[in-house]
Amino acid sequence: MKRRQFIYVVGLATASGGLAIACDTNPNQNQAAPELENELVVYSGRNEKLIGELIKQFEQQTNAKIQVRYGDTAELASAILEEGQNSPADVFFSQDAGALGALQKAGRTVQLPTSLLNQVDSAYRSPEGQWIGVTGRVRTVDYNTNLVKAEELPSSIFGFTDPKWKGRIAWAPTNGSFQSFVTGLRVAEGEERAKEWLEGIKANDPQVFPNNTSIVEALSRGEASVGFVNHYYLQRIKQDNPDVPVEHHFTEDIGSLVNVAGVAILNTANHPNIAQRFVEFMLNENAQNYFAGQTFEYPLAAGVEPKGNLKSLTQLQTQAKKIDLSNLNDLDNTLKLMQQTAVI
């Protein structure tokens, strides 16, 4: 799998201390080229539909020329490690915190200014100040309101291992966001509890789907009672069909894990000043409101509220165990556990 390959590359790069730089015998190449601060190279695990408009706005406001390499978050992180000191990337915009944590642990990210870090709660950025969350992506249990009453739903994600939920659950075990959740479950509750949960859900004969969207669509048709998803998929569907009989349920534990999409400036950045301005831009009020209204994610900069019928981040913080999101990089052991329990 792509994610497994990514973890192996991280380990290799960390052990070897990076890749060697090729030498050039041309003496004219020994002088460093002047930095052009109106240029920026971004490796983005967020697709163009999600951030393309903001990239255009940043270019217009700064008169900068932005080159964006879009792709899978894990593959791009692997590319940064493989490219070593020759990587053209200035900024890495990751779909999840795990990849950011992996690059930090490999020594590929730099300390961000305190003025930037202070804009986001410490729960959603690197404790060492090496990356920062831009938006929050919350795990929820969505449910069909015609099949389940709100008061029937357990306050803990472990409550869904109860046999009364047999045949009523939808999940997507091969989906990256679900695997990140299982990693968070391992970090917060330990290996044995995570194993118990996976085995308990599997014993309840859950319906298997490829992704979050298909789960929410199945819930809307009454094909399942509850499903484990990220919050914004329902928000997007309700934008076009507000009468869909599906609502969010936020458990009072790691079941409401807040993962982040975030950014880091690389230690090989050729354009560090414009890179910092890019991070500042993604955290400004305009960009944060764009994410809240267009992608339905949680804005992480202080003072900007989420859209829709969502719990506040403050409420979610008090419910879910706080973990260092950088530790969500250990997907390899998550995949091993999921294989061991025959979930994948």
Task: Identify the role of each PLM range.
Residues 140-147, 259-271, 290:
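A bilobed periplasmic-binding-protein/Venus flytrap-type ligand-binding module shared by bacterial periplasmic
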Residues 167-173, 281-305:
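Periplasmic-binding protein-like
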